[in-house]
């Protein structure tokens, strides 16, 4: 009897079981040991197959698909170091909640630790980072199909947040054989193959997941007090809902760039440095934080130092999510559901002077950046480049901080990022996944080192189903280190690491459009044409190396000198 045929039957059942739990997208890297899984995925009509030759980028492609679709996404890789390359995306998913199913092909047990080629210890490789791990046995007809499908159903039913690692050993041969063999093994599941439901419909009942969020009994008391709302990472609908809710309460809302609230008090990273603004905020009796992953340095400093009578943090993700370790309440539930069960009461705003400080800070930004074509100016005016009915992917390091501090994005406009572990690896791949999941026009903005780090992901951008612009802000190195007290003598060589490159030839290599504008009107017109023309265009903006960091530091100092506003 054929080992290769049974491997494929085993893999076909595995993939079909995953589709019963909402898996539609599967990302596949080349490899021989993973052949049973790859062929099963290709043959399954319920799956959309994505391919990439780099497993690190493949993991991030899946991460982007999961972010934008809010569905579980599967990944197939071969054995050996291919598996280890999934680590960064797995870590990010664990911190930000995207559901990934990592199907890692493996050598059978007798080939581990004996010098066999491409055989490493894959069981437990990811340590505590996966939410769940399943180590499957080598496929054999001695194990019933019911056991395999029940094992997978149980694991998928438990997967609410983060990654599931399924290690899949396969013995050779991997190719050929009579496809009619072992049909009775698959047929033992009867009419399940014609069904669309899991074999085992397991229901999980952790309270925060199956019950609507219980109303805080004292909410009607606290909503009459002076409160401040902090908005971290959340969805577009939640951002709009929170903005209206806070406005009705009369509570100031300090919105992160990822909050999608429209940042009703823009330039918070600047005006939060003003002593009088801090004095006003100190009068808050309650702070309500929705979402995590705050970007602004000044907001994080205030969030750490504030001492309200009550501090509540609402987010659907598990964990504490509060590095300041406030005494208060950690409420695990979706933001929108919590808001619906805790109605606002219309009240007169109690901290109106904050709006004046915000307006003054924004005016200072406009005055300082007038006539500039710079990193800071692009961050400030980024909203003008956004496509209608599109989405934005924001990179890490300096650019996200500049957009957070100087820009103001439209309320409810979809914004994606990798702000869990905040690495610069895999950003282009993640942006490609976001675009593929939604087929919306997409603007992605990253720095030059981020683009270099994931350069081969430009291959993924060739397959764009909607217009896409990759905006690379080339400040020649990791200029975020110019914001930090790094030793000046060693800063360039050991921290910023300038590479003195441009991206024109990279765009040509991957058959992408390319442009390098020299002014803001030119950039704005280029972006507009890209949305009309379609395809993917890499737009490179070359700027003086440390100007963005220096401008931000200068603006913080200028805003602290704004005259006091009368309450």
From Swiss-Prot:
Q: Which cofactor does it need?
A: Mg(2+); Mn(2+); thiamine diphosphate
Q: Which GO terms describe its molecular function?
A: 2-succinyl-5-enolpyruvyl-6-hydroxy-3-cyclohexene-1-carboxylic-acid synthase activity; magnesium ion binding; manganese ion binding; thiamine pyrophosphate binding
The note on cofactor binding and number reads: Binds 1 thiamine pyrophosphate per subunit.
Q: What Pfam families does this protein map onto? A: TPP_enzyme_C (PF02775), TPP_enzyme_M_2 (PF16582), TPP_enzyme_N (PF02776)
Give, as in the UniProt entry, the pathway in which the protein acts: Quinol/quinone metabolism; 1,4-dihydroxy-2-naphthoate biosynthesis; 1,4-dihydroxy-2-naphthoate from chorismate: step 2/7; Quinol/quinone metabolism; menaquinone biosynthesis
Q: Which UniProt keywords apply?
A: Magnesium, Manganese, Menaquinone biosynthesis, Metal-binding, Thiamine pyrophosphate, Transferase
Task: Supply the EC number(s).
Answer: 2.2.1.9
Q: Which cysteines share a disulfide bond?
A: none
Signal peptide annotation: none
Protein family according to the UniProt entry: Belongs to the TPP enzyme family. MenD subfamily.
Subunit organization: Homodimer.
Primary role: Catalyzes the thiamine diphosphate-dependent decarboxylation of 2-oxoglutarate and the subsequent addition of the resulting succinic semialdehyde-thiamine pyrophosphate anion to isochorismate to yield 2-succinyl-5-enolpyruvyl-6-hydroxy-3-cyclohexene-1-carboxylate (SEPHCHC).
The protein depicted here goes by the name: 2-succinyl-5-enolpyruvyl-6-hydroxy-3-cyclohexene-1-carboxylate synthase
Species source reads: Yersinia pestis
As recorded in Swiss-Prot or TrEMBL, the protein's gene is named menD
């Amino acid at each position: 009897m054929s080992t290769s045929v049974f491997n494929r039957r085993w893999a076909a059942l595995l993939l079909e079981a995953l589709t019963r739990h909402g898996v539609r997208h599967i990302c596949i890297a080349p490899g021989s040991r993973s052949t049973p899984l790859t062929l099963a995925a290709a043959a399954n009509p319920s799956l959309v197959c994505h391919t990439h030759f780099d497993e690190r980028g493949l993991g991030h492609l899946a991460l982007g698909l999961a972010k934008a679709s809010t569905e579980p996404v599967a990944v197939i890789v071969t054995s050996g170091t291919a598996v280890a390359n999934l680590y960064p995306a797995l870590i990010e998913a664990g911190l930000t909640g995207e559901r990934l199913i990592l199907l890692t092909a493996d050598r059978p047990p007798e080939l581990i630790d004996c010098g066999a080629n491409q055989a490493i210890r894959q069981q437990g490789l990811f340590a505590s980072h996966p939410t769940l791990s399943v180590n499957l046995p080598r496929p054999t007809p001695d194990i019933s199909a019911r056991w395999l499908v029940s094992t997978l159903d149980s694991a998928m039913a438990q997967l609410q947040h983060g990654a599931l690692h399924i290690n899949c050993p396969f013995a050779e041969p991997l190719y050929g054989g009579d496809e009619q063999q072992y049909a009775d093994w698959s047929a033992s599941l009867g009419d399940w193959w014609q069904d669309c439901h899991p074999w085992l419909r397991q229901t999980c009942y952790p309270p925060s997941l199956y019950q609507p969020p219980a109303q805080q009994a004292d909410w009607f008391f606290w909503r009459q007090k002076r409160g401040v709302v902090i908005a971290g990472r959340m969805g577009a609908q939640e951002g709009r809902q929170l903005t209206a809710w806070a406005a009705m309460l009369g509570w100031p809302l300090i919105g992160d760039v990822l909050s999608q609230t429209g940042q009703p008090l823009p330039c918070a990273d600047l005006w939060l440095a003003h002593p009088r603004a801090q004095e006003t905020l100190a009068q808050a009796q309650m702070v309500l934080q929705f979402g995590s992953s705050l970007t602004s340095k000044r907001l994080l400093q205030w969030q750490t130092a504030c001492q309200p009578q009550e501090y509540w943090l609402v987010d659907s993700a598990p964990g504490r999510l509060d590095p300041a370790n406030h005494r208060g309440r950690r409420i695990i539930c979706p933001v929108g559901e919590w808001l619906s069960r805790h109605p606002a009461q219309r009240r007169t705003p109690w901290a109106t002077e904050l709006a004046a400080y915000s307006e003054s800070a924004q005016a200072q930004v406009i005055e300082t950046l007038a006539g500039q074509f710079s990193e800071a100016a692009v961050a400030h005016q980024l909203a003008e480049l956004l496509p209608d009915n599109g989405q934005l992917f924001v990179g890490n390091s300096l650019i996200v901080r500049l957009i957070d501090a100087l820009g103001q994005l439209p309320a409810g406009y979809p914004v994606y990022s990798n702000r869990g572990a905040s690495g610069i690896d895999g950003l282009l791949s993640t942006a490609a996944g976001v675009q593929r999941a939604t087929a919306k026009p997409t603007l992605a903005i990253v720095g030059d080192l981020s683009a270099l780090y994931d350069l081969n992901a430009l291959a993924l951008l060739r397959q764009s189903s909607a217009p896409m612009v990759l905006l690379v802000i080339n400040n020649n190195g990791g200029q975020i280190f110019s914001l930090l007290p790094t030793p000046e003598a060693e800063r360039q060589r050991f921290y910023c690491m300038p590479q003195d490159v441009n991206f024109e030839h990279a765009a040509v290599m991957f058959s992408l459009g390319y442009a390098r504008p020299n002014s803001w009107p030119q950039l704005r017109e280029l972006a507009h044409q890209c949305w009309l023309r379609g395809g993917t265009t890499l737009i490179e903006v070359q700027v003086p190396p440390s100007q963005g960091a220096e401008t931000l530091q200068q603006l913080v100092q200028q805003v602290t000198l704004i005259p006091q506003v009368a309450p």
